[in-house]
Amino acid sequence: MITHMQKFVERNSISIKLIVVFFLTIILMIPASIINELVSERKERQNDAIKEIQSKWGEEQTITGPILCIPYQTYDLDKEGNKINVTTHKAFFLPDEINITGSISPVVRKRDLFKVVLYQTKLYFNGSFKLLDFSGISQKNTTILSKDAYFSIGISDMRGVEEFVTFNFNKIPLNCESGTHDNFSKGSGFTTENFDFIKDSSNLNNFSFELSLKGSENLKFIPVGKRTNIQLSSNWKTPSFDGAFLPDKREITDTGFVANWEILDFNRNFPQQWVDSEKDFSSSAFGVNLKLPIDLYKKTERSTKYAILFIALTFAIFFFIEVLKNFKVHPIQYVLIGSALCVFYLLLLSLSEQVGFDLAYLIASISVIGMIVL
């Protein structure tokens, strides 16, 4: 019986070895998937560390505005001519032209092993409102509350504002207070004091203000002008331009970048003026991203996805050497080889956090190849 079994094994040794190698490859998918989960866990810890730093410095910033709001009232009259059913509404107007220029000063901060890009920026805003068109709101029984007019500027994270803001309208300084009366920026931003728009306005109403802002990674804008012009510059060498609009002109060099956008009201999906209803500006946001050029966890995650392929190819090479050269490889040796390949990804993950992905890949490769050869 034993002799018959030995003959069967010898006669089908290649097929049996192929089956063993196949099942070993399947089994080694388990540690490979565990390593992939470990990479995901480290990536989550990185995100937590980044969020912690951002929460104390300032998160990604999106700037909306300025938006001019002029309240008005509609009412009915009773038989004696007294006002009844008085309802207050708000009419919103966007500027005809807005120009924004600014420079971004990035800095890389570190928490444990994790890095995040923070920035400070000084932005200069100027633009104009032409004579406003009230035909859309003027009714028989309507009173425009021009003395209660105000401007709102949305800033997604007010913790990043570094200096008090003075809003200048037709050379009249208007003080600002934190918070917006409207929900176009989820209430985050600042609002000017009330002013008399009819008294203080002219044929061309100019505005200007400066904004010193801190944030992290991303700086975006909403194109509120009938014509929106933005110019940004920075010494960051690896910017990524994202959002609804790419720059019309950009220059990226070893010393930084300069980018220019020119956007028309036809390019977006909201009007120049409206009444009461809220508008969704988020789909029109655009700007620049200052993330680090190398995300080692993404690279490591991509590498681990090919772990099963590397294991299978390595086993195939040894199998064909065994068949063609009559060089016997014990199943335990296949197990050790597969384990060494799994250790490669652990080395890659741990070393890349210290010395960078490229050097870590080289060191891990040399180490594993040495283990297999020896």
Predicted regions and their residues:
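Hydrophobic membrane-insertion alpha-helices, especially the h-region
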Residues: 17-33
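Soluble non-transmembrane domains of integral membrane proteins
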Residues: 44, 48, 55, 65, ...
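Transmembrane alpha-helical segments that form the functional core of multipass membrane systems
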Residues: 281-282, 286-374
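Alpha-helical transmembrane signal-anchor/signal-peptide segments
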Residues: 34-60
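N-terminal Lys/Arg-rich, disordered targeting/topogenic segments
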Residues: 1-10
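Alpha-helical membrane-embedding segments
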Residues: 75-87, 364-374
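Membrane-entry segments of alpha-helical transmembrane domains in multi-pass membrane proteins
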Residues: 15-20, 110-117, 194-199, 299-309
